Amino acid sequence: MPNFSNPEDRESLLPPPMNRRRFLQCSAVVGGGVIVSPLLRRAGDAPAGVPDSLLPWYRLPLCILQTVLRETDARNYDAAAVVSYMKKTGYNTLIVNAGGIVDFFQNPLPAANLDPFMNDRDILREITTACRAAGLRVMARVDFRGVEERVFRQHPDWFSMDAAGKPLQLDYTRPRLYASCYTGYYRNEHAEEFVRYLLAHYPLDGIWHNSIGWDGICHCPRCRESFLQATGAPVPEPESASPAALDGYMAWKTSAADKHMARMQATVKAFGDDKAYAAEVFSMYNPGGRINSGIDLYNARDHFDFMVGVAFPIESTEPTRFAELSYAGTVVRFMKSMAPEKEAVILYGENGTLHRYIMDPPVDLRIYLWEALAAGGRFWNANFAGAYPDATSDRRNAFNNIEACRFVRQHATLLAQHAPVATVGIYYSRPTRLFYRSPSAEGDRFDAAMKGFENVLVEGHIPYDFIPNDQLSPERLRRYRVVVLANVRCLAQPEIDQLSRFVWNGGNLLATFATSLNDGDGTARADFGLADLFGCSFTGKIADTRQDCYQYILQPKHPLVAPDSGATELLFNADRTLLCRPAPDAEVICTHVPEVHNQPPEKAWAESWSREFPTVIEHGYGKGRVLYFANQPDQINCDIGHPDARNLLSRGTRLLAGSLPVETSAPESVHIGLTRSLASPGQYILSLVNTTSGPVRPVRRCLPVFDLEVKLHLAVRELVSHQVLRAQGKCRIEAHGSDVRMRLSRLDDFCAVHFQMRS
C-alpha cells in the first residue's frame, strides 16, 4: 500500500458524494419533492463588493474598445466622436495606436515613421486628452515586430538576420516589414525609449504591446552570442538540425521571450503600478510549429496585468470554420485557472479578423459576449477598419454589444474579482501540447480530446475549469471531485505521484486513450505511467477502429451503460483503440469488437462479440476510483458527436463526481455559468446563456426557451439575499437552507442572478 497522507477536507463548495445506487436513481432533470421556503427578500442594495480604491483599475471589470487605425484615418480623425461612441455603448477603456510601424504622434525619436496623413496634428494627444476629460482609460498600442525599408536602412543592425547575415522580412505583411527579434536593439533599447517617451508625455494608463510574439530563428550577433553562452552551440538551422537541437533552441527562445516581456513590463511599471502592461496570447489549443514564438499564457501571466485570449468566432484556419459558441467561456475559464485574480478578457472583433471590412455574424457575437460574462470574463472589441465602429465601411455591428457593455458598467461592483466554481478539473498539459507540434501517427490531436470533453461538460451543465500542469499541487487537487485527463500523453513522474496520491486519498480520475504513455519530455513509455490507477497495462498494440468497429457491453448493469443495455449489446467506436490487458481487480465494462466487414453484407457477421481487450474500465485505487477509456470518446465527441461517446463521458463524470453544485431542467443549448467572488466570500453569480437556434452556423436567430428550473447546492449555511441582474421572464428564487432554486419563465439570451450566502 502506498504511503500517502490523508487528504484534508474538500472545499466547502462541493456537495456530498453520490453512491452508485443513488446515481442510477437520480435524474439530471430537476423534479418534484423539493422542500421550498417562502420567497426570499431581494437585496435592497447591492452587496458590498471590492472597493475600487483597493484594486488597480485593470483588476476591475473591463470593457475595451481597440481602434486599430489605418494611416488614412488621420485625415478626418474626430476624438470627440470616438469618446461619444464609447460613452453611448458602455466601453470604459480605449486602446489606440501610438506607433512603431506607423506613428500617430509627433515622434522625435530615432526610427520615427510619422503617419503621412497626419500632417502637423498629434492624433494620440487629441484622443488621450478627450478620453481623460471624459473619465475613460487609454492604453497606447505599440508594435515593434518590424519596420519599413526606409527605417531599416537607417539602423540595419537593430534587426533580425538569417544564417547568411541577410535581413529577415515578414512574409505576411504588405509591405514586407523588416523583422525584429527578442534580443535586438529595436525591440529592447529602442522600444524602451519609445515607451518611456509615451508615458512621460501623454496622459496614458498603460501600454498594449501588439504582436509581441515572433516565430522565426534569428542569427543576429546578439542572438548568436546569447545562444552560444546559454548552450555552448551555434544557432541551429531548421533544415539540418535534429529535433533535440530545435527543442534546445526553443527552450532558449522561450527564456529570451520571457526576459523581453519582463524588461518591457519593468519599463512601464517604472511610471507607477497603476500603469498597465499587456499583450495578446493566441489559441490555448494550437500546438504551434517546432519553432514558434515561445510565448503562451504560462509565461505571459507573470508579466501582463490582465489576461487576453484571442477568441474570434470565425477561426483563422484552412478551411475556415466557426469556433464553438462556448469557446469564449472556455478561454475565460482557462485564463482564470491560470491567474484567477486578474481580469480575463476575450479579444474579438465585431467586423472580424479574416474579412475586416465586413461584419462577423451578429448573433454569434452576442452569444460570445454572454458566454464570456457567464464564466467571469470581459471583452475587447478590436476594430480594424476605421476610427471607431460607427465610422467604418460596414457599421451593422457598431452597437451589437451595447447590452453586454452596459451590463458590465451597471454591475461592475458585483462582477469584480469573480472566478468559476468547479467540481471537475480538466488537466491542461503544456508538455502534451508541445508533443503535438508533430502530428501523431495515431491521428489523435491535442485540441480534439479537450474540446470533446468540454462539450460534454457544457451540455451537461457540469461546472469545470482547468488545472495547468505547473500548478499541480495537493491543495489545487483538493478543489475537485473529478480530475479529467483527456488524452494527456505527457506526464512526468512527479505529476504521476501527485495524481496517484490524490486518488489514493479519495479523489476520482477519468482518463482516456494515451494518457501517461509518454514522460514529461515526450519520451515514450512501454506502459502507462498510471497503469496502477487505470487497472490495465498497454500491450503495445493499437487497433484502427475508424470503421465498422464497436464496443461490447460486458457489464450491462453498470451505471455507465445501464440506460442503453436493455436495447443494445453494442456501442459505437471509432478512431483508434489501445489494446490493453486488465488487472485482476479491474471491472471491465465494455470490450473492443474488431472490424466487422460490411461487404458483402451477407458475410457481415460475427459468431460472438470479442471480450479480449477492454475499452472501458472502472478501477478502485485506495479510497478513490478511476474510469479509464482505452479508446477516444472525447475526440469522437468532438469530431463526430455520436451519442454513445457523449453519454459514456457524461455518465462517467457524474458517477465519479456525485452530487453536483448545479442541477437544471434546461436543455443542452442553455449553458450555465456559476462564479464566486474571490474577495467577498459567500457571493455567487449564476448565469444562463441561451444558444438555442437552428441547426447551422452562423446562428440566424436565438430562439427563446421557457419554464426553466435551476437548483444550486453550495454547501453553505443559507441564502441571505439575491439580486436579479438581468432576466427576460419572471425569475423566482426559493430556498431551503443551503439549497437554492431558481425558476425562470422565459430566457431569450442571458440571465444573471447574484446571491449572497452565509457560510
PLM regions: where:
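Active-site neighborhood of glycoside hydrolase catalytic domains
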Residues: 186-292, 299-300
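Active-site-adjacent "subsite" loops/lids of carbohydrate-active enzymes
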Residues: 145-202, 237-250
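Aromatic-lined carbohydrate-binding/catalytic grooves of carbohydrate-active enzymes
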Residues: 89-121, 147-156, 216-226, 292-295, ...
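N-terminal secretory signal peptides
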Residues: 1-18
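N-terminal twin-arginine translocation
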Residues: 15-25, 33-50
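Glycine-rich, aromatic-flanked loop segments that form ligand/cofactor-binding clefts
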Residues: 64, 92-96, 126-170, 208
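Carbohydrate-binding surfaces of carbohydrate-active enzymes
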Residues: 242, 246-247, 251-283, 300-758
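Aromatic- and glycine-enriched glycan-recognition loops and surfaces
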Residues: 71-89, 112-132, 259, 448, ...
